[in-house]
């Protein structure tokens, strides 16, 4: 009897997603060698969020599970389909790289970027790319990796002249969120002033 090759129902997809989330590599290998065609791995999505098995394994730092998922999808699909899978977004616009970055999973981030050319500049629905997620969540090792690999610099960095010579790429920690906070504080202050004026 051959492997199942028809589209999977949601219950079966959720089982695969849960195995990826838990890093249950043995279960995934068993499923995709004895039960289900490997071509279907890239089609599995979590019902609530549209997150893939790759999202789940990457977010939790299960490096061997991530490697297995990528190798399986690579063997069973075209290079174009693999690239689309690596950069696939869920309902909130996050890629697997966003989640690995947010959680500081450096080994997973390196695997995704160095071997599978994951795009760190894809922005989610909040306007954040994977580099911002690493910085914003204080994952300095991941942030440093991104800054060195992609030679990115923060926008409007006024400390360039003071930090020159230390590294080729410098970033003032937290500047993006500081700016957003300043803008929000200013908007709130203006609204408060309007309310006070209206009371008089």
Curated annotation (Swiss-Prot):
SMART domains: ANK (SM00248). Residues 152-173 are annotated as: Disordered. Residues 153-162 have a biased composition (Acidic residues). ANK repeats lie at residues 49-78, 92-121. GO terms for molecular function: DNA-binding transcription activator activity, RNA polymerase II-specific; unfolded protein binding. Residues 164-173 have a biased composition (Polar residues). GO terms for cellular component: cytoplasm; MBF transcription complex; nucleus; SBF transcription complex. GO terms for biological process: cellular response to oxidative stress; positive regulation of transcription by RNA polymerase II; regulation of protein localization; response to osmotic stress; ribosomal small subunit biogenesis; ribosomal small subunit export from nucleus. InterPro entries: Ankyrin_rpt, Ankyrin_rpt-contain_sf. It comes from the Eukaryota. Keywords: ANK repeat, Phosphoprotein, Repeat. The modification Phosphoserine is found at residue 78. PROSITE patterns: ANK_REP_REGION, ANK_REPEAT. Present with 13100 molecules/cell in log phase SD medium. Required for normal rate of cell proliferation. This is Ankyrin repeat-containing protein YAR1. The gene is YAR1.
């Amino acid at each position: 009897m051959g492997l199942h090759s028809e589209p999977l129902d949601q219950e079966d997809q959720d089982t695969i997603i849960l195995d990826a989330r838990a890093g249950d590599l043995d279960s995934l290998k068993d499923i995709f060698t004895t039960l289900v065609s490997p071509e279907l791995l890239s089609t599995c999505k979590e019902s609530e969020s549209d997150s893939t098995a790759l999202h789940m394994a990457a977010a939790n730092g299960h490096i061997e599970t991530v490697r297995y998922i990528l190798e399986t999808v690579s063997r069973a699909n075209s290079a174009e389909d693999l690239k689309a899978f690596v950069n696939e977004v869920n309902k909130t616009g996050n890629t697997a790289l966003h989640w690995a970055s947010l959680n500081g999973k450096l080994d997973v981030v390196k695997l995704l970027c160095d071997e599978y050319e994951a795009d760190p500049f894809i922005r989610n629905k909040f306007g954040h790319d994977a580099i911002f997620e690493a910085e914003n969540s204080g994952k300095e090792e991941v942030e440093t990796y991104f800054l060195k690999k992609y030679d990115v610099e923060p926008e409007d960095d006024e400390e360039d002249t003071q930090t020159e010579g230390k590294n080729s790429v410098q970033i003032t920690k937290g500047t993006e969120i500081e700016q957003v906070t300043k803008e929000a504080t200013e908007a709130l202050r203006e609204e408060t002033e309007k309310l006070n004026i209206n009371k008089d």
